[in-house]
């Protein structure tokens, strides 16, 4: 992406990357963007929600059935969220993709009641996860993501949720025995740029930046999905046992998701936005079934 950006802008545009949380966690990065220390950054839904809470609607539990539904809704709402983020002082450069999120645990988790046997982690300060566990009447262990591995090692927690790739990269899989076969949500991400920094770029280069980022991020999403599929297989090869849910158990999970989605309407996002997404999915599924 950087090479293409430099080429098409005649060397006037380029990114300098700081990987692996060099600049701190997502809240730290947001703070540094506000002070002008960083001009652009990649965020998971957690960080995006700190900026624009309603964007977390794209990560509601059991909302999407497949990647195609995610792509359709994300594209339909791209302009909506671009405008909303601009009002907060950010430019949306493109969607990213963390992946489908599974439970990994030391006890099998096939349905909601199974979580009551676990000491399950919750990303500290995440209103979406908090609502999910509240609906289950389960008290999770709230921790920043940087404390999860040590907490697994010490036994403070024995269940986590993440994408297959994250389980491998963060080494969380080394302290659990099971992985669910049904993801409970999909985690999204995006690249944002400080609006003031963006507006300092001339109009022609703004167009180049937006086009290059969006197209390259689309390719990155496709690659990430393949890598997550491969990572799920790798986790099985590493000894994790897949927990297969029955049709009845899957239905229970979806009903939990629907209640959580309603619980968060008008606190995290509007009923109108939820209804719009529901309508988009209903129409899409008519043609897809």
Residue ranges and their predicted role:
Residues 81:
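Basic phosphate/pyrophosphate-binding loop/patch that engages nucleotide-derived ligands
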